[in-house]
Design a protein with these regions (language model features):
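Conserved, well-folded catalytic cores of nucleic-acid-processing
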Residues: 93, 137-140, 198
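Short amphipathic alpha-helices in soluble, non-transmembrane regions
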Residues: 128-137, 234-241
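N-terminal low-complexity, intrinsically disordered segments
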Residues: 83-91
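A glycine- and small-aliphatic-rich helix-loop capping segment at beta-alpha/alpha-beta transitions
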Residues: 92-93, 123
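Long, hydrophobic/aromatic-enriched structural stretches that serve as scaffold segments
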Residues: 93-101
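A structural signal for small-residue-enriched, beta-sheet-centric alpha/beta enzyme cores
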Residues: 2-17, 25-79, 102-114, 121-122, ...
């Protein structure tokens, strides 16, 4: 009987193998990690971690408020805007505070940044939940990130800025906010100009490679706020010109969303 079952299974597997390529019939392996601190991963080589009781020496060195015994961490190689906007959603949804946001020069050889975000919480369950929300929201905010071998374009939107966006870019709390980030940097100026001409928005700041607003990345990043409709209109205008300009540098390469566009 066992021999018969084995033969049947062999035939079934042969048929599956013949009818579907390996990439279609084999799902990607979920990340395996036995560390209790590990929460998960997301697009952009993003890792989520939680530490229930941070060592007091590390706590002091990071200048974290003593009341926050637990911390949540989002760290990635590619992307700052997606993870920061995702962190803003995480703070809205949990009893946590964003303690640290830093953007190292990275993108794994590209023109932009990576990101380090640290949440503080009095209860480890809140820290873990914040990391979970941020990991869930990160792919959403990669929806309007486009790239080719010559550079990248990033557009982010929220209808209601919260404490993370206020901390990082001085976004007015509760206001709609958008950001434009483009590499090479000149395309960022072109996109910013198109955005502000297209809609009635207020510019918070413009970060260039040398004015301290970026980690010497080959980008110009523009941050602005206004009514929800105006912010979206500005972003759509910037996206239209940005895509056309970046395409000229590598005409043979397709410029498409990293996930699914969400600014519509």
């Amino acid at each position: 009987m066992d021999e018969l079952v084995s033969k049947v299974m062999d035939e079934v597997m042969k048929k599956i193998g013949a009818s579907a390529p390996a990439e279609e019939c084999c799902a990607p392996a979920a990340p395996q990690c036995n560390l209790t601190e590990f929460v998960g991963t997301a697009i952009g080589h993003t890792i989520g971690l939680v530490i229930a009781n941070l060592d007091h020496q590390v706590h002091d060195a990071l200048k974290i408020d003593p009341k926050y015994r637990a911390i949540g961490i989002i760290s990635d190689r590619t992307g700052a805007g997606p993870q920061i906007f995702a962190a803003d959603e995480a703070v809205k949804a949990t009893n946590t505070e964003c303690l640290i946001v830093e953007c190292p020069r990275d993108t794994e050889g590209g023109g932009g940044h990576g990101c380090l975000i640290v949440f503080g919480a009095e209860d480890v369950s809140d820290a873990r939940r914040a990391v979970e929300v941020a990991l869930r929201e990160t792919p959403v905010h990669f929806g309007d990130v486009y790239g080719n071998s010559a550079g990248h374009l990033e557009f982010q939107y929220t209808a209601r800025a919260s404490h993370v966006l206020n901390k990082v870019w001085a976004a007015p709390l509760g206001k709609a906010m958008g950001i434009i980030s483009c590499a090479p940097a000149g395309i960022g100026i072109l996109a910013a100009d198109a955005a502000v001409k297209a809609a009635n928005v207020e510019v918070l700041s413009v970060a260039t490679p040398g004015n301290g607003g970026t980690s010497y990345s080959n980008e110009v990043n523009t941050f602005f706020y206004g009514d929800s409709g105006a912010v979206k209109q500005a972003l759509i205008a910037a996206r239209e010109v940005g895509l056309q300009a970046l395409k000229t540098l590598e005409p043979s390469e397709e410029l498409k969303s990293s996930t699914t566009p969400y600014i519509i």
